Structure formats: C-alpha cells, structure tokens
C-alpha cells in the first residue's frame, strides 16, 4: 500500500485529516529547535528542542525512488515508527519530526499505519526562504496542542470556548437550544498519557 491508499482507508474509518494543516520547521527559529503549527480556526504554535531518536537499524532493505534504502525503527511519544532511509543522500532528515539516521528518510509509518509518509519525488528547486505562513499564532506546548486537537473531536463547543473565549450557541430548526456533536475520532501523532 502507498500513502494515498492508506490515507483513503483511514478516511473511510472516520479518522480525521489532522496533519494536513500541520507545518513542522526543523532548526527554526534556531538550530536545535523545532517549530510546529496546526491550523484550526486560528494557528496554534509550539516550539521545543529537536527530539533525539534512538534508532535501531535492521538488515531489511528496499528501493524507493530508485534509491537503495535500509530499515530502522524507533519509539517516540507513544508510537513506534518504522522508516526506510538512503545513505546515498547523506542528509540526516525526514518527514514530520523524524530525523537522525545516516541518510534521508524516504518512507516512514507508525506501527498502526495511522500515519504514513512516502517519498513520491524530489526536486532541488528551493526559491523561497523557510518561514511561518502566518505571524499571528497562539503559542502553546506540544501537550496543549494535542489536548486541543483531541477536544476538537469530542466537544466542539468547549474547543471553541477555549480558543476564542466565546460560548457558541446552537439551535435546531424549531429554535430549541441544541449541542453540536463531534463526529470523528482524533488521531494524534504524539501520545502523552502512555
């Protein structure tokens, strides 16, 4: 299965598209830092130190985009990740926060296949400096962002109240007050209660 097939399956299961509005900037604003933003009504932002991964290298290999890649596994914030990296591109980076292998990560997935990243092409055509898309952000930490995204799937009124300070009111067709029901399951990359 490729990333698109896995994503389509997850959408059928009712899992949200969290992460589609996530931006991860490594070594930004300073070396050794990671900045993460998530666009939900307004932009949430947190900065933290770059994670240090303890990768276990295996003997498994495959070919991705014409590059011979080798497998490695690690655990980070409640998830076990499997990655394939290529030493032919000696850049110790990868998708999302994943990094620290002796080559570029061209494929990564968590053990439940809820999150999957697969290289589909490469270009060396960078014309714009790396920067935040918006300067107006609500600062938080990683756990607070995860809690807000989880709340978004459970209690929309409370989510909007915490975000805006205003209690939304909802009415049915006859004018009677009603409550919005969240109708999806939050699927977060980072788990803090495990």
Can you say where each PLM-predicted feature lies in the sequence?
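Extended soluble regions of mature proteins
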Residues: 1-194
């Amino acid at each position: 299965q490729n990333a698109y097939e896995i994503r389509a399956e997850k959408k059928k299961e009712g899992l949200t598209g969290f992460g589609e509005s996530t931006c991860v900037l490594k070594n930004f604003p300073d070396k050794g830092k990671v900045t993460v933003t998530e666009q939900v009504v307004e932009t949430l932002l947190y900065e933290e130190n770059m994670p240090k991964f303890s990768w276990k290298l295996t003997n498994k290999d495959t070919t991705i985009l014409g590059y011979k890649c080798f497998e490695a596994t690690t655990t980070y914030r409640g998830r076990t990740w499997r990655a394939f990296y290529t030493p032919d591109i000696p850049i110790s980076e990868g998708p999302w926060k994943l990094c620290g292998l002796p080559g570029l990560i061209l494929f990564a997935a968590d053990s439940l296949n809820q999150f999957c990243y697969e290289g589909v092409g490469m270009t060396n055509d960078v014309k714009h400096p790396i920067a935040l898309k918006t300067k107006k952000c609500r600062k938080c930490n990683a756990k607070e962002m995860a809690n807000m995204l989880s709340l978004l799937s459970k209690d929309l009124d409370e989510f909007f109240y915490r975000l805006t300070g205003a209690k939304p009111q909802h009415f049915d067709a006859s004018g009677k007050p009603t409550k919005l029901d969240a109708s999806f399951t939050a699927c977060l990359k980072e788990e803090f209660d495990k």
